[in-house]
From Swiss-Prot:
Phosphothreonine modifications at: 345
GO biological process: CDP-choline pathway; ovarian follicle development; phosphatidylcholine biosynthetic process; response to vasopressin; spermatogenesis
Compositionally biased intervals (Low complexity): 319-339, 351-362
Catalytic reaction list: phosphocholine + CTP + H(+) = CDP-choline + diphosphate
InterPro entries attached to this UniProt entry: CCT, Cyt_trans-like, Pcy1-like, Rossmann-like_a/b/a_fold
Organism: Rattus norvegicus
Binding-site residues, phosphocholine: 122, 151
Residue segments, region Disordered: 1-27, 309-369
Protein name, entry field: Choline-phosphate cytidylyltransferase B
Amino acid sequence: MPVVTTDAESETGIPKSLSNEPPSETMEEIEHTCPQPRLTLTAPAPFADESSCQCQAPHEKLTIAQARLGTPVDRPVRVYADGIFDLFHSGHARALMQAKTLFPNSYLLVGVCSDDLTHKFKGFTVMNEAERYEALRHCRYVDEVIRDAPWTLTPEFLEKHKIDFVAHDDIPYSSAGSDDVYKHIKEAGMFVPTQRTEGISTSDIITRIVRDYDVYARRNLQRGYTAKELNVSFINEKKYRFQNQVDKMKEKVKNVEERSKEFVNRVEEKSHDLIQKWEEKSREFIGNFLELFGPDGAWKQMFQERSSRMLQALSPKQSPVSSPTRSRSPSRSPSPTFSWLPNKTSPPSSPKAASASISSMSEGDEDEK
């Protein structure tokens, strides 16, 4: 560990390290009672004026290499980061996370400038100092909050809080008549740079609000704030309220259009389904009809079968005539031969006809003899 003497001081009064050789007495042999990093997140970080470091052991200066190698548990590396922290956002949190994780065993102190200093050197803030203090207390990376932090770090302030290193982005911060308020810290070898988070800053957030001022004014009027609270004139208030009513009507019309579109889509889907079902049923009906009444349908075949049966019933087929050589069955008697006799009551129509009938009768008698 470097040996620090009162003679080895920079022009600003901040002591410098003379060498990197360890002293005759190691750090492990010195008992430290410095506050330890927070092990629980169930309570906010304390304020420095409520629980400041009361350690009586000598506070030897550390080099960055020594701090990165690690220090005893009871001697954490005390890292300081300061700022305004107005509208605390993720860029602030990431910067504090980098400061907290610079060394294996670190204790992060965060200084927050008061309203008077901030309004004097930078400008008006959205949040007051009490709100900004509380925002830092509830950040998980912060171990201690220093209220009313100085704009430019002095040797007395660094000695009072036993600060080992100062963490901030490496961009020169010109303010209070200086090109870089951290110049003397860099010269003393106590400055450790962090990286800025691009795309988000307090100024960017304020720019968004100013750019969309009408939108946010209408929003807050709609939520119950008065025109006086928003510093809005009577005419602008009426204009904003009228615009809110117009937006409500537009929203209702939009909702009606969306619902009507949904209804039309549902009707189209159902009609499409009905048409498909109708087509299926119609094809099924046509197929069944053709099976019954088509050219080869079941109805025609049934009609033909029934008609053929009826024809067979009405006109049965005659048995074939027996041949002359076939002998007659003895059980059956020969069918008698009928001779056509002239009707006695009706006289012959002519003498020739009478003679012809008599001759036929005589011939028949002769055959029987």
